[in-house]
Amino acid sequence: MTQIADRPARPDETLAVAVSDITQSLTMVQAINRALYDAMAADERVLVFGEDVAVEGGVFRVTEGLADTFGADRCFDTPLAESAIIGIAVGLALRGFVPVPEIQFDGFSYPAFDQVVSHLAKYRTRTRGEVDMPVTVRIPSFGGIGAAEHHSDSTESYWVHTAGLKVVVPSTPGDAYWLLRHAIACPDPVMYLEPKRRYHGRGMVDTSRPEPPIGHAMVRRSGTDVTVVTYGNLVSTALSSADTAEQQHDWSLEVIDLRSLAPLDFDTIAASIQRTGRCVVMHEGPRSLGYGAGLAARIQEEMFYQLEAPVLRACGFDTPYPPARLEKLWLPGPDRLLDCVERVLRQP
């Protein structure tokens, strides 16, 4: 391993100006790859590792070319042992490195829970902030690609419930690039959940102009009747549903892309609900105690007198993630969302 003096990570170093300082059309896979490349070029302490990330470039080719460019000391393969991957990351961070480990699929993350919950999330608090833990855990996540068991899941609620972690979910290539750059520059551990279904969606990425950092939501579509709060894969679903709602029913939906699940930008949500008076939360995971449950509870606790109707949730079912042939029936889609919209609009 390359010998680098022990010292805590400095965010300003890992968020240096991009090496490829241009605006261009990229897929999400390309945007994440570019973010990793630029972060590694900006700071020699940034290390990328995981199952098949070096020789194969990852199962989705997200890390392709990094080992060739930066060498086997900085981009390397690991055994098929997720707990070990996170344990290695914690140890490297303690020695002054900036690790970016990959868990190959969200359904493979469960063996790593002990290392994540007991050590990764707690080290900064355990040391009263004296030790940084600049670890960004990349996890291809969520459904929509017809994958086998363990290859599609919604793990975000586990991570959000683990105090000490930041949790982000990009929905566009631009967000994928900049949220990853911000995550790598952060002294706290960040769970970076990549929506697999959006991997090949294309968009403009400006690597010279930072987009909003972790903790900031974005209003993707303005509206006046109902606030739809969502993230990841379902942002595009919400936007297309909003078009349908306007064309067929003359309903005006405002769509908020959370981007950051923890910390949460509640101010943006509250400002929207002040205008609309109604809210639907949409996410892929099961309904019971899913991410939307806590968010809906907070909205109703803090904005009860601004609401014209109860907050509803359009989400997955309380079953294990289904086999590929049933996935489309299980995942929330336009029909489930618009049913919730109609129900909140029925309220007087």
UniProtKB/Swiss-Prot annotation:
Highest taxon above the source species: Bacteria
Entry's induction text: Up-regulated upon nutrient starvation. Is also highly up-regulated in a DlaT-deficient strain. Part of the bkdABC operon.
Protein's job: Component of the branched-chain alpha-ketoacid dehydrogenase (BCKADH) complex, that catalyzes the overall conversion of branched-chain alpha-ketoacids to acyl-CoA and CO(2).
Gene3D superfamilies: 3.40.50.920, 3.40.50.970
GO molecular function: 3-methyl-2-oxobutanoate dehydrogenase (2-methylpropanoyl-transferring) activity; magnesium ion binding
GO BP terms in the entry: branched-chain amino acid catabolic process; response to nutrient
Subunit structure: Heteromer of E1 alpha (BkdA) and beta (BkdB) subunits. Part of the BCKADH complex, consisting of multiple copies of BkdA/BkdB (E1), BkdC (E2) and Lpd (E3).
Enzyme Commission designation: 1.2.4.4
Name of the molecule in the record: 3-methyl-2-oxobutanoate dehydrogenase subunit beta
Binding positions for substrate per the UniProt entry: 105-108, 151
UniProt: thiamine diphosphate binding residues: 51, 80-82, 104, 108-111
Cofactor: thiamine diphosphate
Reactions the enzyme catalyzes: N(6)-[(R)-lipoyl]-L-lysyl-[protein] + 3-methyl-2-oxobutanoate + H(+) = N(6)-[(R)-S(8)-2-methylpropanoyldihydrolipoyl]-L-lysyl-[protein] + CO2
Species the sequence originates in: Mycobacterium tuberculosis (strain ATCC 25618 / H37Rv)
Record GO cellular component, one term: plasma membrane
Class of the enzyme per the UniProt entry, highest EC level: oxidoreductase
Catalytic machinery residues: 151
Alphabetical UniProt keywords: Oxidoreductase, Thiamine pyrophosphate
Cysteines engaged in disulfide bonds, as pairs: none
One Pfam family here: Transket_pyr
